[in-house]
Every structure is written in structure tokens, then in C-alpha cells.
């Protein structure tokens, strides 16, 4: 899936569920933006109702536009576990993200995981981003194999300090 990229910055963030991987990615995106770097890509936050996860959204980083990716009890033909993929919504957001890639300095993905890789439009977007030579920051599901680059394993114990280590590494690599 990933073509060899010799010079591109590749940062992968992984760890168990709930340790703060998405929070760290959003922190990094915010700090890069503050340093005048344009970031494109997407993230897929979970949606909870009464403390229970009911689905996932997909959000374009550049425009902050989002829509449902997968939801419990939704009509549709593609099921992933207890969630139904809302293909039209996912496709609309992936098209927005694809249109922003060429304008970006840095690309970001949250997450490269089993669910995202089972959805054809998301899988194609992930492959497009991974094969791009621009710097990349990606959240990697704990079951996915490393893809080269630098890998940071996030834990509850290190999440507050490691985000600065990752940021410093990225900024020094971009300068």
C-alpha cells in the first residue's frame, strides 16, 4: 500500500484505545497551523450518546467540514461490526479532502485502521495520502503494521509530554 518514500517525513502515532491519539494529532495540527503550515487530511472522531459510542464521523482537516462515516442502526448495505457505513457522506468528505491535498504542506490521517481500510473511498484516500511525498502524520490503529518512518507509542503515562517531543521532531524536520 505504501510506496517507498526516501525523504518524506513520516510520523505514526499508535497506542491503545482511549489514550489520546486523536487529541495529540489535533494538538499537532493546531501547532503546525500556528507555525503557518497548511495541513490537509481527515480525522474520524467517535460519536457518543449517553456515554455510549453510536458511530463515527469523518472530518476534513482543512475545511473542518464533517459528516457521518458509520452509525448504529442506519440504513445501508456496508456493515462493519455493529455500524453501517454511510457511503455517500463518507464519499463527499473524502472528495473535499482529496481536493485539498495539493495545497497542503503537511498531510494527516486519523486513523489507518480496520474500519477505514474496509471502506473503499476511505481506503483510496488513505493510499493517495500515503503515496504522496509530502510530510505525513498519521494515527495507526494498534493492529496495523508500522509503515516506516518514526513511530510513537502513546500511553496514559506519556501522552502529556510526548506530544511536545513529536511536535519538536516535526518542526525540526520541516525547517
Swiss-Prot record:
Q: Indicate which residues the UniProt annotation says bind ATP.
A: 15-22, 106-113
Spell out the Pfam families in the cross-references. NTPase_1 (PF03266)
* Origin superkingdom: Archaea
EC numbers, comma separated: 3.6.1.15
Q: Which GO terms describe its molecular function?
A: ATP binding; ATP hydrolysis activity
UniProt KW keywords: ATP-binding, Hydrolase, Nucleotide-binding
Keyword Nucleotide-binding attributed? yes
Gene3D superfamilies the UniProt entry points to: P-loop containing nucleotide triphosphate hydrolases
Catalysed reaction(s) here are:
a ribonucleoside 5'-triphosphate + H2O = a ribonucleoside 5'-diphosphate + phosphate + H(+)
Q: Does the keyword Transmembrane apply?
A: no
Say what the protein does: Has nucleotide phosphatase activity towards ATP, GTP, CTP, TTP and UTP. May hydrolyze nucleoside diphosphates with lower efficiency.
Q: What is this protein called?
A: Nucleoside-triphosphatase THEP1
Which species does the entry assign this protein to? Saccharolobus solfataricus (strain ATCC 35092 / DSM 1617 / JCM 11322 / P2)
Amino acid at each position: 500500500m505504501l510506496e517507498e518514500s526516501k525523504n518524506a517525513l513520516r510520523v505514526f502515532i499508535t497506542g491503545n484505545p482511549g489514550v489520546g491519539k486523536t487529541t495529540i494529532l489535533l494538538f499537532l495540527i493546531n501547532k503546525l497551523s500556528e507555525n503557518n503550515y497548511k495541513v490537509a487530511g481527515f480525522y474520524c472522531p467517535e460519536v457518543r450518546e449517553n456515554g455510549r459510542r453510536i458511530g463515527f464521523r469523518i472530518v476534513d482537516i482543512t475545511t473542518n467540514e464533517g459528516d457521518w462515516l458509520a452509525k448504529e442502526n442506519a440504513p445501508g448495505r456496508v456493515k462493519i461490526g455493529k455500524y453501517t457505513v454511510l457511503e455517500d457522506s463518507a464519499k463527499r468528505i473524502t472528495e473535499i479532502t482529496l481536493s485539498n491535498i495539493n495545497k497542503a504542506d503537511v498531510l494527516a490521517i486519523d486513523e489507518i485502521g480496520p474500519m477505514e481500510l474496509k471502506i473503499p473511498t476511505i481506503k483510496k484516500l488513505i493510499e493517495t495520502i500515503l503515496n504522496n511525498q509530502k510530510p505525513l502524520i498519521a494515527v495507526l490503529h494498534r493492529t496495523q503494521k508500522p509503515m516506516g518512518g518514526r513511530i510513537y507509542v502513546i500511553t496514559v503515562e506519556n501522552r502529556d509530554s510526548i506530544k511536545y517531543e513529536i511536535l519538536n521532531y516535526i518542526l525540526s524536520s520541516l525547517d
